[in-house]
Amino acid sequence: MLGRSSPSYTVRGYSLPRVGTFSSRPRSLAARAFARNSVLRQMDWVLIVVVSVLSAIGVLLVWSATQPSLLAAGANPHTYLVKQALWAAIGLILMFAVSFIDSRRLRSWTPFVYGATVLGLLAVFATHAVNGAHAWINLPGGFQVEPSEFAKIALILALATVFTQSRWRGTPGLRSVLLALACAVPLLALVLKEPALGVALVLAVVTATMIVLSGTKLRIIAALAVIVGGAVALVGGTHLLKSYQLTRFTSFLHPSADLAGAGYNAAQAKIAVGSGGMFGTGLFHGSIVAGNYVPAQQTDFIFTVAGEELGFVGTITIVALLFIVVVRAARIAVRTDDLFGVLIASGVAIWFAFQSFVNIGMTIGIMPITGLPLPFVSYGGSAIFADMIAIGMLQSVRRHHSVFTD
């Protein structure tokens, strides 16, 4: 005896499925989160994973670099570990928060971001100098903020806004370049006044690159390069640089002239990087790190810790991860249909590429010492916050203005 089959229905000539053939099971939370056009699907997860790994490496290196001196002083050996881990976690939260903001809204916030940054750069001169520099603002609880790190973000937003608005009227001309310089010069002047030469170099390179990428006429760029180059050549040695900064450049050109003085940092850095061999001594087992022979080894010279304790394999891994960050930022710039987004992504890519090159270069002796942290790795809350906010800006551009959604 045959069983009764489920009824089927015909509506306007179309046969609908029989009863019971539809699945009533809802999709999983993960499936819904990564569904097409969902927020998480629009994120660049390669970029997120890479910066997370870099931050984790940084936490471990900072811990290894600071533990010996803290133990010798009878202090908590995990102090810097806890701080850096906390700052990295807060940085990731900031990254995700910024990624949810449409980049067009970021453009409307540019005047406020720029103004707040200028006020912060002015406020540092009301504080006491640390190691001869007015670079930090003291906050309750023993925390400090370094406004010059956020000047990179303010500059990129300001230049992107200027060139986007000028592009609506045609190819950017002299007026647009002068407006861009009017945004860049105050930041450069205040940062140099601190003094923070490394940050000033980043700001200068980002400014020059964004002017070129904006589509400004070549004759204007050439004339500007001649004028700026001549001005720097005339006053650079006597007014722009402090005596110790000139000494750093001299020691870079003649590294063996004063190994016990101006050339000490560079010499010890090269020894530390080269002593690790292929695989390094292992975390917490570096004799040069433990002896604290390299000054500022948890900040500007964190790459020396990687060189000694992680060896060539570890350092090349860090370089590869930083390279991926730059490539992903450039990829976002190429695949963006909005000029403001293109300039934002390009500015961030140049920032990370140049700063990484200078930091690593000064530890291996191919660049002078300028006092720049290694992005995502060096110790410091302001630096990692600025780095993560920049990654959030990249995610925002990708989510809202990317031509492709892969």
PLM feature spans:
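Hydrophobic alpha-helical transmembrane segments
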Residues: 86-94, 309-327
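Interfacial segments of transmembrane alpha-helices in multi-pass membrane proteins
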Residues: 101, 192-193, 211, 326-338
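Interfacial segments of multi-pass membrane proteins
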Residues: 163, 201, 206-220, 287-314, ...
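Hydrophobic alpha-helical segments of polytopic membrane proteins
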Residues: 111-112, 118, 174-192, 197-238, ...
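Hydrophobic, glycine- and aromatic-enriched re-entrant/interface helices and adjoining loop segments
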Residues: 130-138, 144, 220-317, 337-341
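Membrane-helix boundary/helix-loop-helix interface segments in multi-pass membrane proteins
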Residues: 2-54, 60-195, 360-373, 379, ...
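Loop-to-helix entry and N-terminal half of a specific, functionally important transmembrane alpha helix
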Residues: 332-370, 377
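Transmembrane alpha-helix boundary/anchor motif
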Residues: 93, 101, 158, 240, ...
